[in-house]
Curated annotation (Swiss-Prot):
This is Circadian clock-controlled protein daywake. One of its GO terms (cellular component) is extracellular space. The lineage of its organism: Eukaryota, Metazoa, Ecdysozoa, Arthropoda, Hexapoda. Epidermis of newly eclosed adults. Named 'daywake' based upon its function in daytime sleep suppression. Component of the circadian clock or downstream effector of clock function. Required for suppressing daytime sleep (siesta) under ambient environmental temperatures. Part of a heat avoidance mechanism that modulates daytime sleep behavior under different environmental temperatures to minimize the risk of heat exposure. Under cooler ambient temperatures, suppresses daytime sleep (siesta) and thus allows for longer periods of daytime activity.
Amino acid sequence: MQLTGASMFLVWVGLLSWVSCRVDASEGFPSPLKRCKLQDESCLLAQAQTFFQAFKNGIPERQVAALEPIALGTMFIESGGHSESIKFKLTMSDAKLYNLANSMMVKSLKGFTKDLTRPLKLTLLLDNPELEVRAKYDVDGKLLILPIVSKGDLTIRLNDVHTKVWITAEPVKRSDGHTYLNITDYKTATKIKGGHFDLSNLFNDNKELRDSTLKVLNQEWSTLALDVQPKINEACAKAFSAIVQSLWANIPYDEFFEKE
């Protein structure tokens, strides 16, 4: 399940945010972060982890949005015929992703180079033990022969999310003499152990009908995820593409690492 297109952007955002407050090497990085040597992956991983905790509220002066929560906007989802027993049209509005900054574990980060004559290719391994998407929902569908037409609050809990990320970024030299990066491509491969849906106001909160319906929905998690996952992943990618591009517009890559 490719939910965490978001995750791949966040780590790269975090790493580049080390210099977001002070680009000049003589001024140092905003506490508690520090510049790393190019090949020191353990330092890069440590600083990426620190970033999530230190800047979960974003960096307003750089127009970097908050990491807790992450605004995903509105998603329109329609069942794709994966199950005859469940058919629906679902709108998720004011959607937000929670617990990414609090639970992110960066397991590997490779591909940094000083060669600015060709595209940078990064590979990342990311783990999140638990993520949560919350939104307002509006659904029109059916479960078996039971119609489901409802509005309310939706929560999707995602457990043990493991993501591999590939990012390609093009170095661009500007008139100021510095080189900046522009993302040209990204790919993800994500596995998730399981998930859980919770919807308020089903059948006007008739407890018996609500509980039995949610039980069936959660038993069909894998089927539902085939339709819900791509839309969430698309929303995450859009949100973090904007974050990365706005940040990279002000941060020269050629001043990123500690001098050797």
